[in-house]
């Protein structure tokens, strides 16, 4: 009996799950969440998530980002946070999550010391 190879990265684990369960839900967006962020409510399947992750990672790569870069994410708890995180991870980019509740001094310190090359803010 053959077993699947153990994924070596978070993105590899995601891709393995997406290949195994493409039509299963990956994320669920509740109506309250959808209303708050102006996005569509419902489920995002692994297949749809994998397609978005691929498209986002291609865009980041074309923009010159790759292994060794750091990108800050300030997107609150939206689906795009997770999709962008997987896209960046695919390229070896480190994610610097930013809590939207940080005070200005905390935010200044985090940005000043994390050596980010870009930030995604929504």
Summary of predicted features, one role per range:
Residues 6, 23, 27-78, 82-86, ...:
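Conserved AMP-binding/adenylate-forming core of the ANL superfamily
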Residues 12-13, 63, 90-122:
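Structural core segment of the AMP-binding/adenylate-forming
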Residues 1-12:
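Flexible, non-catalytic linker and terminal segments flanking ANL/adenylate-forming cores
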Residues 8, 37, 51, 94-96, ...:
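Residue-level marker of intrinsically disordered, low-complexity segments enriched
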Residues 9, 45, 121:
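Ser/Thr-centric signal marking residues that sit
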